[in-house]
Amino acid sequence: MAAKRGRNRSPSPDPEGMFAGMVVFMVEIGVQRRRLQIWKQKLVQMGAVIEEDRVTKKVTHVLAMNLEALLHKFGKERLSHFTARLMLYQWLEDSLTSGEKANEDLYVLKIDSEEVDKPKKSLPAISGSEDQSSPQKRTRYSPDAGDFKGVESHSNTQGSPDSPTSCSVPSTSASPGEGIAETPTSPQSESTSVYKPPDLNRNITEIFGKLINIYRALGEDRRSFSYYKAIPVIEKFPTRIESVDQLKHLPGIGKAMRDHIQEIVTTGKLSKLEHFETDEKVRTISLFGEVWGVGPATALKLYEKGHRTLEDLKNEDSLTHAQKLGLKYFDDIKTRIPRQEVQEMEQLLQRVGEETLPGVNIVCGGSYRRGKATCGDLDIVVTHPDGQSHKGFLTKFVKRLKEMNFLREDLIFSTHSEEGTDSGVDTYFGLCTYPGQELRRRIDFKVYPRDIYSFGLIAWTGNDVLNRRLRLLAESKGYRLDDTGLFPATHSSSGNRGARGTASLKLSTEKQVFDFLGFPWLEPHERNL
């Protein structure tokens, strides 16, 4: 019998690895099979032994997605006799991300709470983690969007051409080993990528979403991001939150955040938000910050000039062309785009792209690729497999789309592929219309050389929690990561790490980037962290 159990254990642990000495039992409830297998492989590679059959006295750690999953698997009575440490999978993710074992005490699951006597009957699969990308284009946060979009860029135009962000096509990177994403060919393949968290606590996430927008408008991106990180955690929580005691072990939910949640579940409102909404300056700056192209500095200047409404801004001569368009189509741009509409527009772009340049690869990234139900805008990531034909494509593509009356107004247009400047990336930001409609939608195109396409696809798929984690992980290993590559970081004369090197590592697929950084592979629809 002992021999049989031995065959079920993962073989050959590294005796000197980070997890050496650990014997781990992994609760499968709420975890996708592929993710579970990856975690097991990582544990074994780094020294742990996996116990597949049952929790024996040799088991040192039991990992679970949450307390409900643990209770559902074993029951409270049986758990009370375990000598192993009961811990969240988040501990494993954070350890793998940082490259060293995280403090176990912060991830322990406790079973002595009276409110957990009865486990829930059904538990949704959850795949999680967390991030923020560098300052980039500003759009109003919606709980359905899940993208954090930072500050205004140069020339007061919203969104730097070098800064990835927002929404797009299904989970299309067919397999981790393939470099070019493929378009799904059936409703079945598309539906499997849809992101559907339990979302039982919109009373909390909607208030946090409003605070995100206010803090962004005030230029306080760090505070804004703290609420942004908390929202996916709350969205994925499998039950209605009635007490903050339910959240004490969750990542990204600190004491201040728990105090806000307690006030919301107790009173149905948040005094901090009410204060902001009654403050004329905050209210006005927040409103102006919702205009495409207007960041915190510009919003404050407009307020100090005496403007208080969007109607006032229509007579403001200092607005740029892009800001005037953002003002003119303010309501259109704020209107979210249904998933089906994004899919149809993406297919139109692929068809026109193929007519313009056979073999071109066009993928809609961002929230849509991550499986969200709606998008704030469309982020289109483009390349060509031969590594050369993408040069000059965007100019011809935009011209054709304008002839079709699909692209209507330009915001930003910069080309570098033919000159070889700016990493050879071409950029177009503008407004488009769905066929048969006049409602303006925001659309961005980024055309990448094939050899850096994987970096662009990761960056423009997001989410921003993931992007930030990957950047920090790269920095910890002596690299700088952005949408154009992974570069060895140079050092200043004082020995401090400075700017990035000039040559990027050659990593042709998203999975190769994840693997090099040592971050567990996530399918696009798993990246709503």
Curated annotation (Swiss-Prot):
Pfam families reported in the protein's UniProt record: DNA_pol_B_palm (PF14792), DNA_pol_B_thumb (PF14791), DNA_pol_lambd_f (PF10391), HHH_8 (PF14716)
GO annotation, biological process: base-excision repair, AP site formation via deaminated base removal; DNA replication; double-strand break repair; double-strand break repair via nonhomologous end joining; nucleotide-excision repair; response to UV-B
Domain of life: Eukaryota
Compartment(s) where it occurs, according to its Swiss-Prot or TrEMBL record: Nucleus
Gene Ontology terms for molecular function: 5'-deoxyribose-5-phosphate lyase activity; DNA binding; DNA-directed DNA polymerase activity; manganese ion binding
PANTHER family xrefs: DNA POLYMERASE LAMBDA, DNA POLYMERASE TYPE-X FAMILY MEMBER
Protein name: DNA polymerase lambda
The species this protein was found in: Arabidopsis thaliana (Mouse-ear cress)
